[in-house]
Amino acid sequence: MARYTGPRDKVSRRFGVALFGSTKALEKRPFPPGQHGMRAGRKKKSDYGVMLAEKQKLRFQYGVLEGQFRKYYAEAARRRGITGDILLQLLELRLDNVVYRLGFSNTRAGARQLVSHGHITVNGKKTNIASYSCRPGDVIAVGGKASSQQLVTRFLDLTQATVVPDWLECDRDKLTGKIARVPSKEEIAPIVNEQLIVEFYSR
């Protein structure tokens, strides 16, 4: 399955929540897109439909393909602890998401491009894999090229009001960040019910 590149507001309207940051689309049209959107919004979903929607919301939020998402769930289920919480942590520690959380980009899609185009380093080494799993102690930095630094500096102007979460350390002047620790579920503040995703895969 290819990565979704269509209108993001339509996806947010489909699920009734802003998946990609604030949007006025939900205020103007608080119902699913399409010819029968208003009627579809009033339909009661089956239990399966509710669980599927939660999975899709989380997948779209982080820009993860279906196959990748299944692998994240399998890894979360394999580890000791609360599966839903671990799933959220695995997604949150993706390199593209960390770049986004640091404010080096104003969207996850933009952060993914920064990584894939070689603008980001991890512990001093260029890393162009958006799904790279960061660990506590990892130092994330913008590459030394002037073009990389100018690009991220422009993004920082757009994200000045962004609050960097406590599990990250950020030096905006040096364009660097560090993973201080693994984030808690409360810090991630998911917009989904992750337990329903666990139930979806446990059927």
Curated annotation (Swiss-Prot):
Quaternary structure and interacting proteins, as annotated: Part of the 30S ribosomal subunit. Contacts protein S5. The interaction surface between S4 and S5 is involved in control of translational fidelity.
Signal peptide as annotated in the record: none
Keyword set includes Ribosomal protein: yes
Single GO molecular function: structural constituent of ribosome
An example Gene Ontology CC term for this record: small ribosomal subunit
Purpose: One of the primary rRNA binding proteins, it binds directly to 16S rRNA where it nucleates assembly of the body of the 30S subunit. With S5 and S12 plays an important role in translational accuracy.
Family affiliation: Belongs to the universal ribosomal protein uS4 family.
Protein's name in the database: Small ribosomal subunit protein uS4
Keyword rRNA-binding belongs to the record: yes
SMART domains recorded: Ribosomal_S4, S4
Keywords: Ribonucleoprotein, Ribosomal protein, RNA-binding, rRNA-binding
Gene Ontology BP terms: ribosomal small subunit biogenesis; translation
PANTHER family: 30S 40S RIBOSOMAL PROTEIN, SMALL RIBOSOMAL SUBUNIT PROTEIN US4M
NCBIfam families, A to Z: PRK05327.1, rpsD_bact
Gene3D superfamilies for this protein: Ribosomal Protein S4 Delta 41, Chain A, domain 1, RNA-binding S4 domain
